[in-house]
Amino acid sequence: MDERLVSTEADNHESAIEQSLRPQTLSQYIGQQKVKDNLSVFIEAARMRQETLDHVLLYGPPGLGKTTLASIIANEMNVQLRTTSGPAIERPGDLAAILTSLEPGDVLFIDEIHRLQRSIEEVLYPAMEDFCLDIVIGKGDTARSVRLDLPPFTLVGATTRVGLLTAPLRDRFGVHARLEYYEQRDLAHIVSRTAELFEIGIDLRSAEEIARRSRGTPRVANRLLRRVRDFAQVLGNHSITEDIAEDALERLQVDKLGLDHIDHKLLLSMIEKFRGGPVGLDTISATIGEESHTIEDVYEPYLLQIGFLQRTPRGRVVTREAYEHFQMEVPIRD
């Protein structure tokens, strides 16, 4: 798969950059107003009762700030944040070691929690409900179960695929918060804030131009800003102007709607070779040289979101809106 500027996933280098940009409090966090308002109430109530915050499940598309919110929750509760991920916990003993090392009130953040194995999930159930850990000592006839008390803690789970969580695990979270794609004005505010942290000037129109092409995702907005900053600095500018932003984004092949060269390749292949569809997923895969699951999981979601692609029982279909975006005549379908 080609490297994409508009990918919503982060690599290791980018994760380190994101950490340096993260807001530390709910008041600094831009966007997701309903989620922020509710979390603010739950956090304040827990502090007033001098209790741990109820377990929190954050879900939604990647790149929207779930990890940042977990860090903010810990900061607002004035406790330590412990971070791990579903794939990193390979055995029940790995999770037991993490749980027994927690201090009272700590926030344990598990990213990609939907990827936990079932046997590991079962260790979490008593830990989440009763703050205890059931372990088996010995084998065979001599085996016996021992219950260890755990300090009260808050589990924050994050997932991009909430439907893959088992019902018993999902139901043990007292707070469920879905993160939505960002409004353009909030993304422009994020771009301006990041530019200030990068110590480079940017005007409102330039911030809005970057925001417009960011697919509603802060991670994409910050990545595009970094690349536009490169163009500005090489040109000898200490500030990003609208002309520089537009020129840089066009050279980076990110169009006005945030579509990149791979999106264009997929849509134009369907239009030019199959009259816009319907086309089967395997056929599209063979035509553009990408794996079917990559098309389905990586490329299609945004095209579906903006209404450029439809899934039908007979296959994928390019919509009128996509034809109009490419300034092409819409075919008359049978």
Swiss-Prot record:
It is found in: Cytoplasm. GO terms for molecular function: ATP binding; ATP hydrolysis activity; four-way junction DNA binding; four-way junction helicase activity. Residues 1-182 are annotated as: Large ATPase domain (RuvB-L). One of its GO terms (biological process) is DNA recombination. Transmembrane segments: none annotated. GO terms for cellular component: cytoplasm; Holliday junction resolvase complex. It comes from the Bacteria. Mg(2+) binds at residue 67. The keyword Nucleus does not apply. Keywords: ATP-binding, Cytoplasm, DNA damage, DNA recombination, DNA repair, DNA-binding, Hydrolase, Nucleotide-binding. ATP binds at residues 21-22, 63, 66-68, 129-131, 172, 182, 219. The keyword Nucleotide-binding applies. It catalyses: ATP + H2O = ADP + phosphate + H(+). Belongs to the RuvB family. Has 3 domains, the large (RuvB-L) and small ATPase (RuvB-S) domains and the C-terminal head (RuvB-H) domain. The head domain binds DNA, while the ATPase domains jointly bind ATP, ADP or are empty depending on the state of the subunit in the translocation cycle. During a single DNA translocation step the structure of each domain remains the same, but their relative positions change. The RuvA-RuvB-RuvC complex processes Holliday junction (HJ) DNA during genetic recombination and DNA repair, while the RuvA-RuvB complex plays an important role in the rescue of blocked DNA replication forks via replication fork reversal (RFR). RuvA specifically binds to HJ cruciform DNA, conferring on it an open structure. The RuvB hexamer acts as an ATP-dependent pump, pulling dsDNA into and through the RuvAB complex. RuvB forms 2 homohexamers on either side of HJ DNA bound by 1 or 2 RuvA tetramers; 4 subunits per hexamer contact DNA at a time. Homohexamer. Forms an RuvA(8)-RuvB(12)-Holliday junction (HJ) complex. HJ DNA is sandwiched between 2 RuvA tetramers; dsDNA enters through RuvA and exits via RuvB. An RuvB hexamer assembles on each DNA strand where it exits the tetramer. Each RuvB hexamer is contacted by two RuvA subunits (via domain III) on 2 adjacent RuvB subunits; this complex drives branch migration. In the full resolvosome a probable DNA-RuvA(4)-RuvB(12)-RuvC(2) complex forms which resolves the HJ. This is Holliday junction branch migration complex subunit RuvB. It comes from Bacillus pumilus (strain SAFR-032).
